[in-house]
Amino acid sequence: IQSSSMDQGILTEDSMNSFIRTLIQAGIWKNKVPKQTARTKDGMQTTVKKTEAEADARASQDTRLGFQPIVSVDVELLRQQRRFSSPRVLLSENTPLEPPPLYLTEEPVVLNRTSRRKREGKSHRGEYSVCDSESRWVTDKSSAVDIRGHQVTVLGEIRMGPS
């Protein structure tokens, strides 16, 4: 799945809130402990949740080992969020070959001179980015600070598709 800012509308606060709400409901926001399914003697399924102590012990062990959480994301969840777009985020199953460009280089052909004049200067991308200002891929980052100053965890890998 790929998402690019060229073919999608402007990201509104409502669409971002909707996307975050969907992630929360899917149980993948803020390292939520997943529920596990167990079978009883009569064959019925029950849902068992890990205790907080088990989750905390596992999280501290993972942190000591330098483990970054891996989250499975259903491909259909990402397909539903077509209006989510960012010039700094590309959702794809393939590893990128090179870092994203910092400036838009290709200008679309438009017959309207007024529109062309507005775009004459280089269009700056990522002005309000939540990413570090680096023009290379950062692969060893485990935490970052978002635009509101909150500490967030950077996921090492996101699995898409059936588990």
UniProtKB/Swiss-Prot annotation:
SUPFAM superfamilies associated with the record: Cystine-knot cytokines
InterPro entries: Cystine-knot_cytokine, Nerve_growth_factor-like, Nerve_growth_factor-rel, Neurotrophin-3, NTF3_N
Chain residue ranges for the region called Disordered: 36-61
Listed Pfam families: NGF, NTF3_N
Keywords from the UniProt entry: Cleavage on pair of basic residues, Glycoprotein, Growth factor, Secreted, Signal
Any one cellular-component term (Gene Ontology): axon
Keyword Chloroplast part of the UniProt annotation: no
Signal peptide: 1-3
Gene3D superfamilies hit by this protein: Cystine-knot cytokines
GO terms classed as biological process: cell surface receptor protein tyrosine kinase signaling pathway; modulation of chemical synaptic transmission; negative regulation of neuron apoptotic process; nerve development; nerve growth factor signaling pathway; neuron projection morphogenesis
Cell location: Secreted
Primary localization: secreted
Propeptide feature: residues: 4-119
Family assignment from sequence similarity: Belongs to the NGF-beta family.
Function, in words: Seems to promote the survival of visceral and proprioceptive sensory neurons.
Name of the protein in question: Neurotrophin-3
UniProt source species: Boa constrictor (Boa)
